[in-house]
Amino acid sequence: MPQNERTYIAIDLKSYYASVECMERGLDPMQTNLVVADPSRTEKTICLAVSPALKAYGIPGRARLFEVVERVRQVNAERQRRAPDGRLTGRSADDLALKADASLAVDYLVAPPRMAKYIEVSMQIYGIYLKYVSPEDIHTYSIDEVLMDVTGYLETYRTTARELARAMILDVLHTTGITATAGIGSNLYLCKVAMDMMAKRVPPDENGVRIAQLDERSYRALLWEHRPLTDFWRVGRGYAKKLEEHGLYTMGDVARCSIGKPNEYYNEGLLYKLFGVNAELLIDHAWGWEPCRMADIKAYRPETNSISSGQVLQCPYPYDKARLVVREMAEAVALELLEKRIVTDQLTLTVGYDIENTASGSYRGETVLDPYGRKIPKHAHGTSTLGQKTSSVRRIVDAVLGIYDEKADPKLTVRRLTVTANRLMREEDILCEPEQPVQFSLFDDPAARERQLRQEEAKQKRERRIQEAMLGIKKKFGKNAILKGMNLEEGATARERNKTIGGHHE
């Protein structure tokens, strides 16, 4: 292999959450009808995963539970029509049994999410990868997906990328019972596209493993005419819509546009006009190029960062009850800042309203369309900038509630809330910054002002000790070991959220 050529592998665990739940029940993940969803949240809840056997009936991986119910009802109506004597005599969630007996109705299991279990298994699988590749050459893209630079390992192991990918996948399969899909590419983009788009077309082997491979030449030959554009990594609906509005429907169209002459309509200037500096990445990907390497990912540090807490409420909340939840969320963000020893001087609140506000037709304010095309009131949004960086619960809660009181409409019911702490900085870095001067007016009493500053400093130190004590108790005995009176009020959500990971039960 030439010195500048590299080889990357992307591995995606097949229907990961569903596979974990099947294995925990001693069932075959490839042959069992199962969805991971929380039925206690009504049938509108989104399924976190759908097993491959159930997907075969035309159910998408991120369906809502009622869509699964309806599709299975349709499938069973068709099976009944074709069944002997037009009658179904039993039910089964096993795909092999359903294929062998036409008189059985399709059934499925609903497994409530268990995020702590999924994280535990994911860490176990990551440990398997480390048997083959060092952590410096692995990027964890998500809980069920990794990207690897295996360039330096192929000669060491005297193997090919395909054989190495297969060895790792089979090791995971034999250890956990979970199979996977892999993509191999000459850069990070191509290995991801090979996994996401090409591996789906490859027939599985006897273990259900699919592996696909792309280089720049094969990418252009196989995918330049592919539609829709949204199938490609990092091309969302907004990008695709803009491109299609200008007659660009494929990656081949984008590539050809990028080499158009200056006097032609289709040239790279059009792409930069549409997408700004982001056009550079789009053009690179259209040609199958990706300059970023694993070392770049490992060295990357964002210029700005933030911490946020968001939730979708179980039902529409009136103004006062939503304010209680905002207070809880602001306090949780402040405690997270303290735990991580970081501080902020800017807070943002976003309040999303429920569709019931427009259902009667009496709402006359500004509206937007939700993802389902329904009109809802435009969300409220505000930012508060503090005078200095802090992790004080008191100051953060006061600032966020101030935004809520100013921006939220008391007449509307609330469904979504997001609190974000921006412009974060580590506490130790604050010590290196010069102290901000205090400006006095002609009417200020310097001595009184000095006393006031000292009192505020003492108050902050007392609050800090209390917050540290609360964190210590929560770490030792659990997040619900210490609660405030507001957490016990009707409509409060902190107690339940403390039992979850990523919004789902542990």
Spans of features found by a protein language model:
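Acidic, metal-coordinating catalytic segment for phosphate/diphosphate chemistry
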Residues: V20, R374-E506
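DNA-contacting surface of Y-family translesion DNA polymerases
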Residues: A10, D231, R237-V414, P434
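A glycine-rich phosphate-binding loop feature that marks nucleotide/adenosyl-phosphate handling sites
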Residues: S186-Y189, D284-A286, V343-I355, T413-M425, ...
